[in-house]
Amino acid sequence: MPAAERREMVLEAAVAEFAAHGLAGTSTEDVARQAGISQPYLFRLFPTKKALFLALVERCFRRVEDTFTAAAGDLTGDEAMDAMADSYTRLLDDRTLLLLQMQIYAACSDPEIRDATRAAYKHLWEMIERITGLPFQTVVDFFAIGMLMNVAAAMDLPSVDERWTSWCPKDADDCPKD
């Protein structure tokens, strides 16, 4: 199997491990085992555990960007923003991705991870501004609601109190229900 395919297998295995255990708690031995490779081979693909985690930071933000870009299509303004918001509620159904996002933010005490996360977040922000053309404060509100959605979904608050689904459009079929 080519190294690029093995690298993808490692990233897939690493997503689940890092989402569950975070940067400090994840064992590269466990990632290698889940990927079906040896730990020394893992380190040929990714020289350090941090390098592997940084690849996941990039991958996670790229997935959100790709989702938003596809949702917005040729739309602009509020229509694009609404389409991206709706697509994000569906993206949050992937609990592993959601928990990985939370672990990425938690790992920002490491300067290298913080810099990579900040750069990816900035790129996402600028993309949304470019696509929507909406004012700065509207984009601030979009990100604030998105972060609230992350935290509420991570704690599974919608299953405890239906008021936590109030950010969902009334006709949305894909928002959490009790």
Each model region followed by its residue ranges:
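Helical hydrophobic small-molecule/effector-binding pocket
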Residues: E79-M102, A107-D115
